[in-house]
Amino acid sequence: MKGDSEAVTSMRRRLVLALGGILLVCQMISVFWLWHESEEQIGLLVDKSLSAAAQNMQIDQEINEAIASLSIPSLVMVILTLLMCFQAVSWITRPLSRLQEELQDRTAENLEPLPQQSDIKEIAAVTHTINQLFQRLDETLKRDRQFTADVAHELRTPLAGIRLHLELHQQQHQIDCSSLIKRIDKMVKTVEQLLLLARVGQEFSAGHHENVAFLKDVIFPMQDELAEMLQKRQQRLKWVLPQEDVTLHGDATLLQLLLRNLVENAYRYSPETSQITVSLNTQQHVELQIEDEGQGIDESKVGELSKAFVRMDSRYGGIGLGLSIVTRIAQLHNGKFFLSNRPQGPGALARVVLTTPDNYPDAA
């Protein structure tokens, strides 16, 4: 422990040593120059062989050299001091730059402790404090995920019991409970999505990822299911897909859930016999787009629509968690979710920008 404490230096100490070294070097240059000029002047005074005219000429020359000996070293020292101070500050603040790069390159889900790479006391203290903050945030997020999983798990059994009771009540008393049963089914589906999101979210935080081929593992397995869903309202599903597949780090099940929720949201808010277009762009990054032909959205409330329990229109079914789950899945994949109106014609445009291993976009 004693050796470690002695190895740790202070930023203030480094700054004082650097400035002290700069001042010492500049002062030595000035002293050497003045000593050289003083030696010439003393030699002139003791030289008796010079005539009066020669002495006056030499005196004038020495005066000019004395002025130059004061002004030129001062200018040189100012320039050298600025250059050396710049280099010293760069040397002292280099650990801060490394710390900034380490934090800037991190994703929102990466709460691993920062490595202690600096022997400067202040930098080590900041790194330790940030690591403590990461630990508290990680524990809070784990508690939130566990709470979500526990609540969702506790809701599954009573919801199944309520559904069974409604079916028996409908059979025995000839009462139409189909609308209530449909609501129960939607709640069960939402609970299962929350359970899935909580489980995979914990795996993501632990660093467990897999390589996902977006067309093969996400799009193709969902095409029949989504087409069957849209047939209930005679809606058409158009696919605009690239020829080549693209691979990213993530979870195929979560990405399928993201696609299902976006298409289901468009299906719910689009009129019958309308068209829903699903496009995948992989030129610069993975961008999934879902366009519908509904009434569009109020763009002043875009930030509210992706929050939990907020619905676009209370006339339609749903709990209001679909877009919130989409936002969370996009964040887990180091991506972003955007919702706006279509540029051409009525309808909404949902965009999910995801990252590939070699590309981290900053979408606007």
Curated annotation (Swiss-Prot):
Question: What is this protein identified as?
Answer: Sensor histidine kinase PmrB
Q: Which InterPro entries match?
A: HAMP_dom, HATPase_C_sf, His_kinase_dom, HisK_dim/P_dom, HisK_dim/P_sf, Sig_transdc_His_kin-like_C, TCS_sensor_his_kinase
Chain's gene name: pmrB
The record places domain Histidine kinase at 150-358
User: Which compartments is it annotated to reside in?
Assistant: Cell inner membrane
Its job: Member of the two-component regulatory system PmrB/PmrA involved in regulation of virulence. Functions probably as a sensor protein kinase which is autophosphorylated at a histidine residue and transfers its phosphate group to PmrA in response to external pH and iron.
* PTM: Autophosphorylated.
Residue intervals on the Cytoplasmic side: 1-14, 87-364
- Keyword Zinc in the entry? The reply is no
* Keywords, in A-Z order: ATP-binding, Cell inner membrane, Cell membrane, Kinase, Membrane, Nucleotide-binding, Phosphoprotein, Transferase, Transmembrane, Transmembrane helix, Two-component regulatory system, Virulence
PROSITE patterns recorded: HAMP, HIS_KIN
Q: Which reaction is catalysed here?
A: ATP + protein L-histidine = ADP + protein N-phospho-L-histidine
Instruction: Kindly give the PANTHER family that the UniProt entry links to this protein.
Output: SENSOR HISTIDINE KINASE YKOH, SENSOR PROTEIN BASS
Show the coiled coil region(s).
Answer: none
Transmembrane parts of this sequence: 15-35, 66-86
Q: What does the record say about its membrane topology?
A: Multi-pass membrane protein
> For the HAMP domain, which residue ranges apply?
90-142
Q: Which GO terms describe its cellular component?
A: plasma membrane
Per the UniProt entry, the Enzyme Commission number(s) are 2.7.13.3
Q: Which residues carry this modification: Phosphohistidine?
A: 153
| Main subcellular location of this protein, as a coarse class | membrane
Question: Which top-level enzyme class is recorded in the Swiss-Prot or TrEMBL entry?
Answer: transferase
According to the UniProt entry, its GO molecular function terms are: ATP binding; phosphorelay sensor kinase activity
